[in-house]
Amino acid sequence: MRLFRLELKRILKSRRTLILLAIALLLSVAMAYLPISFEGINRPNEDGTVTELDGLAAIKYKQDLYKTSAGEVTPDRIKSALETYQSCVREYGPVEEEGFPLAVFIEKIVPFRHLLMGLSEAFADPLTGIGADLMDIDPNDIDGAYYEKCAEHLQDVMRNEQRENETAQQKALEKYSELDTPFYLHSGISKDAFDYIELYILFLAILCVAIAAPTFAGEYQTGGDSILRTTKYGHKQLAITKILAAFTLFVVTFLVGITVHILILDAAFGTDCLKTSFQMRYSIINLPNINLGQLQIILAAAGLLSVLATVSCMLFLSAKCKDTLTVLLISIVVLLMPLFAYVAMGAT
């Protein structure tokens, strides 16, 4: 235990380590602020003027608007929202055009638009998968059959993408039937907030790799590796101690950083929106039976495992390579390789 404390103290005495840890915590705050700053909305005033709201002011204003649509996503509510949308479009023209009255948009469209997000997808063309225009959907087709329509769309997608794999098609439908319905919606938090959680985890992994790179390779450069090979408490015991000290530091750093990051986001966007079903924020045919709050936990847990896996790979390289720079470069390539592979596979 004393050896463990001394090793941890040795790591923390490094100015380079302290700077990188400070950067990790600063990034936690800065990257949580970015999706908050991206929020914006125009608020019509009684005198006919328009006020541009950004950041927390925009979030607060949107929260007040979204309260009317919060609750279970029932077919009746979706039908009512669609009828309101179609009525407004017939009277004022397409919502996307500049001529659409801002006051009408804020009062009748914004509060309920997230209820309609999955509707176009659910009524998509069964062959092409192209979403239906909301104006082409008959509100009467939604009565009591909305979730059946979602399941039909999933069946169409699986038939198109897994044509040769009937087992996968059946498994997807079985998994979808296990979802808790009706879905729940409390709009507020944006997709950007979750994207930045993932991006922060990536940066955190890079910083942890930079901190841990000299763990063994640095000893080779200074000649300190002779202690590992010749002393009474060297060999396996000292190596394990160095690894445990590094892991402890990274786990604590990750937990503090990701906790601060998520707390800032939840304080800004509110915790009510975390009850929203995963399907109402992403695709209506997503299979995970979770809400956005659980998604945050899953991202954090998966992120921690990813960081520890990356650091484990880096420690192995640090033990094999003779200089820190080589370890650092190879580790970063390994860390970013899944991103490059994803882009390459997506392109093909």
Each model region followed by its residue ranges:
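Hydrophobic transmembrane alpha-helix segments characteristic of membrane transport
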Residues: 219-226
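Short helix-to-coil transition segments within interhelical loops
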Residues: 229-235
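Secretory targeting signals
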Residues: 25-89, 94, 138-219, 240-323
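Aromatic- and glycine-rich beta-strand/loop motifs that create alpha-glucan
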Residues: 1-18
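Central hydrophobic cores of alpha-helical transmembrane segments
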Residues: 24, 325-338
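Aromatic-anchored segments of alpha-helical transmembrane domains
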Residues: 28-32, 333-343
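Residues that define the loop-to-transmembrane-helix transition and helix capping
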Residues: 15-18, 236, 324-325
